[in-house]
């Protein structure tokens, strides 16, 4: 009888239909960090930091940059005759200048506040160059022979294309005066200069007087310049120097020039047609036939990642720069390998015993076994809900760090090294803060994502438990054993949430009572065996005590045994 009960119990356990809830497991080696754990293996993750670039300058949104070639920014603005190839360039997405161009200010000198002009002009996307004063429109001065061997063109002496070097005419240099009225309706950049001869004799030869001045005035500007005559070392064959100045003339504003010598007069000015988020890069990189939406100093970036680690000096639609090379955001659940052996008869197990490598198109799902066989399927509803949440999380990470910041690195010359150092220090501080915030944000989000996956699996398990009610037994490992027959149609109802426990309530009740009865009967037989064993053991102990007493009594004469025949 005991053997029959035991086999019946085994038969019931093996043959019962079963459904389990679990999650994906795969061969991924992706590791992420959380706020409390490092190197957590997950089934999938997203790299948030872009490190790849084109290694060249590219057009932005179809608009080409302008390369100054062998010309410097100052040489371009003043019109170095060796920069004539740039004359037709009036529109660009950004400007590229070599670190050490050969064609700068050919006659030795400086462009005052060049760094500020670079910064202003880096945002200019288009200008219109026009003749502000004709070369011979300055009256009784000579405007045609102001050339120098320092600015040669085609083997002949020349001068800056956008300027006119006015000298005496027939031994006289009267006071000259001209006014420009800005009626363009846009800002106009105008440049002028003053010549500083090396000797008084040179000054007298050129301007026929011992002293001279240049006065410039407008509604917002008023300065008077005089030549600084001094002996200097020769540069490019010249002991003299030239200093150039500039002014942005607003619409409706007028600017007046007055001089009696040493005047470098403006000939062409720049009407600023379009201003935007431009940039001036200093780099040896070439401009290639490529397109990008984000350009850095060392190459273009085409990415949809949230951050980049290419270079902080950028233009375009760029992700935020951080000083870390990798930030991985977990998307899938923890990658816990499945237990190799599930026991007899191809047994299945739930999420407590590890993930499922066979789960396709989902993070969570069901595995079942019945008379029709075994099967596995993803729960698309809970998976899609999790995908939507995590996708939204990835898309919103940058929005949490939406502080506007633009680096001005490399837009200052060596003369302004202190400004460079201060700018770099500010840039470094801001980037450090952003990088720390990004790392902390990813750690927190990874922790929340893994908790989300754990919660989703448990919620799915709880959903099935509430659906099945007393029609199945919760095995405690993520699986349920049915008290009724559950074919594939029945299994599918459990998966899609249309299972009706009342339909199988009566069958489940009968089978549950039978199983519980078998357990109870089996338990009764065990108790019976234990009772018999206890009785026999007690009898043996009692007999041993009686025999011991008799031996003791006989040995001391208290008891006598007489045998009669």
UniProtKB/Swiss-Prot annotation:
| Processing and modification events after translation | Palmitoylated.
- Name it: Hemagglutinin
GO MF terms listed in the record are: host cell surface receptor binding
Stretches that traverse the bilayer: 532-552
According to its UniProt entry, what is the function of this protein?
Answer: Binds to sialic acid-containing receptors on the cell surface, bringing about the attachment of the virus particle to the cell. This attachment induces virion internalization of about two third of the virus particles through clathrin-dependent endocytosis and about one third through a clathrin- and caveolin-independent pathway. Plays a major role in the determination of host range restriction and virulence. Class I viral fusion protein.
User: Sorted alphabetically, which SUPFAM superfamilies does this protein's record hold?
Assistant: Influenza hemagglutinin (stalk) (SSF58064), Viral protein domain (SSF49818)
Q: Which residues lie on this side of the membrane: Cytoplasmic?
A: 553-565
Species, as recorded: Influenza A virus (strain A/Duck/England/1/1956 H11N6)
């Amino acid at each position: 009888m005991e053997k029959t009960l035991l086999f019946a119990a085994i038969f019931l356990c093996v043959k019962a239909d079963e459904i389990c809830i679990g999650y994906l497991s795969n061969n991924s080696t992706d590791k992420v960090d959380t706020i409390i754990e490092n190197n957590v293996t997950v089934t999938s993750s997203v790299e948030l930091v872009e490190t790849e670039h084109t290694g060249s300058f590219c057009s932005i949104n179809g608009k080409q940059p302008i390369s100054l070639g062998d010309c410097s920014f100052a040489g371009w603005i003043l019109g170095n005759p060796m920069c004539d190839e740039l004359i037709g360039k009036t529109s660009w997405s950004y400007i590229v200048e070599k670190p050490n161009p050969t064609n700068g200010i050919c006659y030795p000198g400086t462009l005052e506040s060049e760094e500020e002009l670079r910064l202003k002009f880096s945002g200019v996307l288009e200008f219109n160059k026009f003749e502000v004063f004709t070369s011979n429109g300055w009256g009784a001065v000579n405007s045609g022979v102001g050339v120098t061997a320092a600015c040669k063109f085609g083997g002949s002496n020349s001068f800056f294309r956008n300027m006119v070097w006015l000298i005496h005419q027939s031994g006289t240099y009267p006071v000259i005066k001209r006014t420009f009225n800005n009626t363009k309706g846009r800002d106009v950049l105008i440049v002028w200069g003053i010549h500083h001869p090396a000797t008084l004799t040179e000054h007298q030869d050129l301007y026929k007087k011992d002293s001279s001045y240049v006065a410039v005035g407008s509604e917002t500007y008023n300065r008077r310049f005089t030549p600084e005559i001094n002996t200097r070392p020769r540069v490019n064959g010249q002991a003299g120097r030239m200093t150039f100045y500039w002014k942005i003339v607003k619409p409706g504003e007028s600017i007046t020039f007055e001089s009696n010598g040493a005047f470098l007069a403006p000939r062409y000015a720049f009407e600023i047609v379009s201003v935007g988020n431009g940039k001036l890069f200093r780099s040896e990189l070439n401009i290639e036939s490529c397109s990008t939406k984000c350009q850095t100093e060392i190459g273009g970036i085409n990415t949809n990642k949230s951050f980049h680690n290419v270079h902080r000096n950028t233009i375009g639609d760029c992700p935020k720069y951080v000083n870390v090379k990798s930030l991985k955001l977990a998307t899938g659940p923890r990658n816990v390998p499945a237990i190799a052996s599930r026991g007899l008869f191809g047994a299945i197990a739930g999420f407590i015993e590890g993930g499922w490598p066979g789960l396709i198109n989902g993070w969570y799902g069901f595995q079942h076994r019945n008379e029709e066989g075994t099967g596995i399927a993803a729960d698309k509803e809970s998976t899609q809900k999790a995908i939507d949440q995590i996708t939204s999380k990835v898309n919103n990470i940058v929005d949490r760090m939406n502080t506007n910041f633009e680096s001005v690195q490399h837009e200052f010359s060596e003369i302004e090294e202190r400004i460079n150092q201060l700018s770099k220090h500010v840039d470094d501080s801001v980037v450090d803060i952003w990088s720390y915030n990004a790392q902390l944000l990813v750690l927190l989000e990874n922790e929340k994502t893994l908790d989300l996956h754990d919660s989703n699996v448990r919620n799915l398990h709880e959903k099935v438990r509430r659906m099945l009610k007393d029609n199945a037994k919760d095995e405690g490992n993520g699986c349920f054993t049915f008290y009724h027959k559950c074919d594939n149609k029945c299994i599918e109802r459990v998966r899609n949430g249309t299972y009706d426990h009342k339909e199988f309530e009566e069958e489940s009740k009968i089978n549950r009572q039978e199983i519980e009865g078998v357990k109870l009967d089996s338990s009764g037989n065990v108790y019976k065996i234990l009772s018999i064993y206890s009785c026999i053991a007690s009898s043996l102990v009692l007999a041993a005590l009686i025999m011991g007493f008799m031996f003791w009594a006989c040995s001391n004469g208290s008891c006598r045994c007489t045998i009669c025949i």
